[in-house]
Amino acid sequence: MILKKIKSLRKFFILIVSIILFSPVLFSANISSKHSLSILNSIGTRDRGLMNSAFLIPKDSSAVFINSSSLTTLIRDSINLNYTLTPNFKEEYLFNASYSHTDNVYAIGIGFASELSKIKTYNISRQKENDILSGNYLINLGAAYMINETSYIGGNIKAVINNFDNHNIFGGFLDLSYMQSIFNPALKIGIGIKNFGFYDKVFAAIDTDIITSIAYSKEDSSFAVALEYDISVPSVSHKISLGLEAMIIDFNKLGLFDSNIDYDDLPESVLDEPSHMQKRHLTKLPSGILGRLGIGNKGVSLGLSLYVDLFRFDYAIVFDNFNKNNISHDFGLSFMF
């Protein structure tokens, strides 16, 4: 019975993916322009340091922006906050926040992102007038289901509001994702469809992204490597990125923090949980300093993290399009509980 349900879920997922893949192409003749919204691609600072390649290797609630199916692999409930300092930081303000809850066989997440820009205005005499504040806002609701201990499926519903001088433009989008462990739990493959929907009353006005990825990540978070390839349709643009993460200084090995958890210390409610939930609660929490490197056809990035048990501080510097004049600095905080 369980095997039949798994096969049915996979068939349903393949059907939905096929419809999404070909729908933009079928309707492309009626679309006047193709473009993307940067706010739809909001991500956490950790993923920025990996040059957007963390599709299969999440560590916090920002997974709701990237790949909801991976929410079920998080070992704790999580809150994540991120701020981006752009080259035009005096006129641009980029922020996102997320929360996730992981249960027995499901997980849920919610994310909010905002992009605010100051636009200077001048009168006929070229005298400066009041600035106009333009904003993009995103609300992202994600959910995931664990088919079995190696397969996960997830989806998102996203709403976008573009506000400019009291004028609003609305959009609605759908994401779907699937990931699976192969050979051993540390090696994963996955596929996702992002940003399928409408914007300003036009279907497929925004590119739909098709994502494929393969990654290897050690359970103790000391090492991870990921390769991701994206294609956007119907504009047919490509993105490939490779990310590497490694522990530089391990506080646990130095004896600075004791992250070991004994069954005797756990409440009975945890001991009554299924074995995979017990494994999550018993997972040794990383503590230390991690370094990251990401490179792809869209640029290069470097990142650092300070892990202390349930707290993590992230930093990333991103050279978009390999341009020294287009450098962004990202700062992030994560809390698990």
Model regions and ranges:
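Subset of outer-membrane beta-barrel
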Residues: 29-337
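N-terminal secretory signal peptides that target proteins for export/translocation
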Residues: 1-10
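Bacterial N-terminal signal peptides
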Residues: 14-24
